[in-house]
UniProtKB/Swiss-Prot annotation:
Keywords: Antiviral defense, Endonuclease, Hydrolase, Magnesium, Metal-binding, Nuclease. CRISPR (clustered regularly interspaced short palindromic repeat), is an adaptive immune system that provides protection against mobile genetic elements (viruses, transposable elements and conjugative plasmids). CRISPR clusters contain sequences complementary to antecedent mobile elements and target invading nucleic acids. CRISPR clusters are transcribed and processed into CRISPR RNA (crRNA). Functions as a ssRNA-specific endoribonuclease. Involved in the integration of spacer DNA into the CRISPR cassette. The gene is cas2. Transmembrane segments: none annotated. Belongs to the CRISPR-associated endoribonuclease Cas2 protein family. Its cofactor is Mg(2+). It is an enzyme of class 3 (hydrolase). It comes from Chlorobaculum tepidum (strain ATCC 49652 / DSM 12025 / NBRC 103806 / TLS). InterPro entries: CRISPR_associated_Cas2, Virulence_VapD/CRISPR_Cas2. This is CRISPR-associated endoribonuclease Cas2. Its EC number is 3.1.-.-. Homodimer, forms a heterotetramer with a Cas1 homodimer.
Length: 96
């Protein structure tokens, strides 16, 4: 299933900047960045549970916010892209 993860982290303190880096790194481990604070994560249910848990453990609920948009398994017909930054194929081969 494709989950769109968005976040807004308060970066006024060093701790906030650390949270931002950790949340971004966690999202990068599960998906691709499509905007500064937006990631597309193509995950199975077990991966989703781990991703959500890691993100919730990193955030400060009094200062930060996370949003999850579930686009499901048939997401290809629900996502359109226009403009700069060619989209990457989430189903394609990833070379590290």
């Amino acid at each position: 299933m494709l989950v769109l993860v968005t976040y807004d982290v308060n970066t006024e303190t060093p701790a906030g900047r650390r949270r931002l880096r950790r949340i971004a790194k966690t999202c990068q481990n599960y998906g691709q960045r499509v905007q500064f604070s937006v990631f597309e994560c193509n995950v199975d249910p077990a991966q989703w549970v781990k991703l959500r848990s890691k993100l919730l453990n990193e955030m400060d609920p009094k200062l930060d916010s996370l949003r999850f948009y579930f686009l499901g398994s048939n997401w290809q017909g629900r996502v359109e892209h226009e403009g700069a930054k060619e989209p990457r194929d989430l189903e394609g081969t990833l070379i590290l």
